[in-house]
Amino acid sequence: MYFVHPQIKLKELKKVNLSERLPFYFPGKQIVFTDMGRSAFKIIAENLNLQGSDLLMPAYICDVFTPVLQQYNIRPVFLDIDLKTFHIKKEEIRKKITKKTKAIFICHTYGLPFDVDALRKELQGFQKISIIEDCAHAFGAGVGNKGEAAFFSLYKQFPTVRGGILVCPKDWQVSLPKTSFNLRDFVSFLNYFPAFAFLFKRYGSEIAPKVVRREKMPDPASLNKRSLCLFSRSLGYFEKSLEKRKELALFFQQELKKLGFEVQEDKGNVFCLLSALVPKDLQDKRDEIVKELRKHRIFCIRIWKDPIVLDKERFPNTFEAAKRVINFPLQNHHTKKDVNKMMAALSYILKKK
């Protein structure tokens, strides 16, 4: 069985000292663990005084930020994306800056680092515009240090159930209330084990309605101790196996290209989500392909398949990506044999289309 979300290998859970390890990733920065990544974004919005301002951001992004933007009266100014990177089009940035623009929100989409240095040059000559890095998919990609602030979403890459990291200047005063690991968190934790994950995928909607993972408090809060412990015990194996993951992802991409898929650029990519666009002649059958793969116990996803923008003419690439993207399973413990099994199933399905 193959799943996109992180899976637990018990023998690889070895605790590391986070207070010693994390400064290596974020030198000279303050590191704050939050209940969720969006909690960290709220703290950033407050400390950068974004209330009532314009925020440049990708049109191809999760709708989870919408309530935060509304809460702080921030007007999103959307930019279309490049289909090879899934990043915002740099050529659109200058055209979209307004007198009320205080920040630009960039996303290291699917694990591919966005060139923040090039963005700095692009912003020269404008009033002070802060750069906010959305690193939800990109822990280990060397990102999070070049903007005014950054945030990570731990459970996208680690079996932590929930959790975010705020990376910000040391002079920010951040004090957060504590949270606890509850029953719903425990049920979510079981999803990191393949047998339970399969049962949840197969019967979950019959047992209980799907509930979006939300913050435990209306205001930003800290990460519970059990999730923090899971992160500390997963980080060592993540670091040790990251290069193997990258190598396997490149092999996976080459196999996908043989079937006509268009793959994301790979330079610096940590492949949190190995994502590809189905061939254009099959784009109307993308959802059928995903459903057929489930019969082979290959559980792909299609994140952001429903664009948060409505104007297809202004954001053509965003709509195309939403219609064609498939996010394939890739775990750090997978091998080429696993990839070959998935590709054999995919090839069989495509031949019937």
Place the predicted regions along the sequence by residue.
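Conserved PLP cofactor-binding pocket of PLP-dependent enzymes
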Residues: 188-191, 266-269, 286-325, 348-351
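Active-site C-terminal subdomain of aminotransferase-like
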Residues: 171-225
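Conserved glycine-rich beta-strand-loop-beta hairpin in the small C-terminal domain of fold type I
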Residues: 6-8, 221-242, 246-253, 263-277
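Conserved PLP-binding active-site segment in aminotransferase class I/II-type PLP enzymes
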Residues: 1-51, 72, 237-240, 347-353
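Conserved PLP-anchoring active-site segment centered on the Schiff-base-forming lysine
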Residues: 44-99, 292-293
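Active-site phosphate-binding strand-loop segment of PLP-dependent enzymes
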Residues: 84-175, 331
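Short, conserved charged micro-motifs
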Residues: 174, 281-289, 334-340
